[in-house]
């Protein structure tokens, strides 16, 4: 299955300490990594590079340009009326082998 990950796509982190939080893709580094931001005041996710296997795309997308600043992303989220949607945390649905299954 090919993930639809493009600039402005709202994603959910499925692994790591920020699992279950939503973020926005602001840049595509290569076929394995993207740069995301919450921005931190809205979702608690700070701007960072993440592996695409650690995020799950949603059907929502906001209109931003590549490399947009956190302020520009926050304004675009407010303009799209997605502030409450972005603040909601979801239970990540990571499908893979867990440590318990390897024993």
Curated annotation (Swiss-Prot):
Alphabetically ordered keywords of this record: Ribonucleoprotein, Ribosomal protein
The keyword Ribonucleoprotein appears for this protein: yes
Gene3D superfamilies documented for this protein: 2.30.30.30
Record-linked SUPFAM superfamilies: Translation proteins SH3-like domain
InterPro entries noted in UniProt: Rib_uL2_dom2, Ribosomal_eL14, Ribosomal_eL14_arc, Ribosomal_eL14_KOW, Translation_prot_SH3-like_sf
GO cellular component assignments: cytosolic large ribosomal subunit
Record GO terms (molecular function): RNA binding; structural constituent of ribosome
Protein name: Large ribosomal subunit protein eL14
NCBIfam families per UniProt: PRK04333.1
Domain of life: Archaea
UniProt organism field: Pyrobaculum aerophilum (strain ATCC 51768 / DSM 7523 / JCM 9630 / CIP 104966 / NBRC 100827 / IM2)
Family affiliation: Belongs to the eukaryotic ribosomal protein eL14 family.
GO term, biological process aspect, one: ribosomal large subunit biogenesis
């Amino acid at each position: 299955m090919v993930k639809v990950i493009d600039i402005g796509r709202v994603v959910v982190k499925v692994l790591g300490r920020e699992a279950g939080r939503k973020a926005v893709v602001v840049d595509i580094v290569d076929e394995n990594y993207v740069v995301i931001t919450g921005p931190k005041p809205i979702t608690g996710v700070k701007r960072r590079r993440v592996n695409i296997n650690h995020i799950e795309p949603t059907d929502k997308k906001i209109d931003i340009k590549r490399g947009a600043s956190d302020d520009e992303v926050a304004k675009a989220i407010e303009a799209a009326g997605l502030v409450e949607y972005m603040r909601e945390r979801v239970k990540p649905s990571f499908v893979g082998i867990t440590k318990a299954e390897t024993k």
